């Protein structure tokens, strides 16, 4: 099984946190590594978005790739927009939702999520997303999929058919814009729904529909770690698309 370079716990700066698509944390917590570093584990899969899945009870950030955020759009060659973020989530769901995958544990990221390379059968799903043009090779942290990205770019596949803002830039820009209008510059929305306490990042597809008015304990957070420590969980992006009423009420 081919794997990208091993990464352990990442503790760096605010800029690093924004690139990963999250706010600055206090500490890493929440998602412990299920097995020792560089060993395999398996389980049934639930899709969060184009580069994040749950395998059993473990939240996985797919190593070496960065997919468009679910609310993100890209442009075709003719300049028209398409929902590249939704398409990336859909492609991931088609590959793995409800299926057993085998993942190689590369350690934890800053937020305690397990970094992993995952396979369904013999298919490397990290690699496949880059081949489909539905994820960037995350070369700041791994060069495992540079060749696949070059091939997708050459054939103008997926995000390479027209203009597409890299996901890390999209997150940073969206965070900055939301923080300018959020109370005390803390733009994470902590909603209370029939499904429990759920927080939405500024790039969540339902972010603009959530109203934080103090009703039923709804509140703002400055960091994901703060939200998690208070008992909120991240919104499941795909489920939010298919079951939006429960996520938003």
Segments and roles (model prediction):
Residues 29-138:
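Electropositive
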Residues 86, 90, 94, 127, ...:
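Solvent-exposed, polar/charged alpha-helical surfaces in well-ordered, non-transmembrane soluble domains
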């Amino acid at each position: 099984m081919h794997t990208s370079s091993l990464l352990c716990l990442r503790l760096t700066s605010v800029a690093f946190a924004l690139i990963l698509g999250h706010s600055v944390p206090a500490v890493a917590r929440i998602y412990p590594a299920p097995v020792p570093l560089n060993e395999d584990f398996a389980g049934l899969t639930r899709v969060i978005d184009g580069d994040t899945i749950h395998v059993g009870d473990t939240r996985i950030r797919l190593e070496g790739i960065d997919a468009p955020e679910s609310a993100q759009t890209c442009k075709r060659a003719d300049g028209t927009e398409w929902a590249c973020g939704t398409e990336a989530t859909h492609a991931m769901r088609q590959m793995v939702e409800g299926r057993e995958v085998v993942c190689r544990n590369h350690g934890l990221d800053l937020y305690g999520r397990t970094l992993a390379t995952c396979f369904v059968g013999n298919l490397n799903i990290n690699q496949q997303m880059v081949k489909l043009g539905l994820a960037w090779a995350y070369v700041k942290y791994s060069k495992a999929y540079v060749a696949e990205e070059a091939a997708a770019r050459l054939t103008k596949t997926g995000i390479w058919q027209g203009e597409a803002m890299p996901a890390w830039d999209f997150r940073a820009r969206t965070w900055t814009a939301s923080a300018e209008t959020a109370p005390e510059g803390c733009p994470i929305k902590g909603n209370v729904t029939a499904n429990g306490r759920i927080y939405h990042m500024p790039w969540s597809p339902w972010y603009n529909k959530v109203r934080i008015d103090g009703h039923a304990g709804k509140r703002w957070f400055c960091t994901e770690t703060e939200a998690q420590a208070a008992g909120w969980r991240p919104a499941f992006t795909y489920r939010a698309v298919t079951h939006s009423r429960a996520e938003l009420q």
